[in-house]
Amino acid sequence: MKTLTKEGVVNMKIVLVSHGSFSKGLFETMEMVLGPQEDLSYVGLYPQEGIDALKGRIEDEFQKAKEDEEILVLTDLFYGSPFNAVVQLMNDYDVYHLTGINVPLLMEILLMRGNGKCAAEICEEAIKLANETVKDVKKYLTDLLALEEGDEECETSF
């Protein structure tokens, strides 16, 4: 369900869930780069905690969502404990869930949300963009140098 606010922004809560403080770091980085973000929160799993405590804190974030808000959860590691906790909660909550989150992808997701895309559209687009968020810098610089020197055979596309 795509519900727009009067400003044309989709009502969507995004919850970052990770091992340790990675999700907090993502949150702080986005605030530094994009400014304060409404309806963006984070939950981290720490060594002294069990999965049930993590699930409880994730569930608390889900319950903070407004009735008309979609919920998009972004986890750090496929089949990691945070991922598994969210999957278990998906039995009781209608949430979207992407895993393998990183800074460039999160930035794209937040920008898409701000441009009125719903969670389903964001998930589809994020999967397409994911491959572009990791770069081989050595190859990039080598190919860039080759382009500057007039080598037409370099493989870089940027």
Features from the language model and the residues they span:
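N-terminal loops that bind phosphate or other acidic moieties
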Residues: 2-72, 78-158
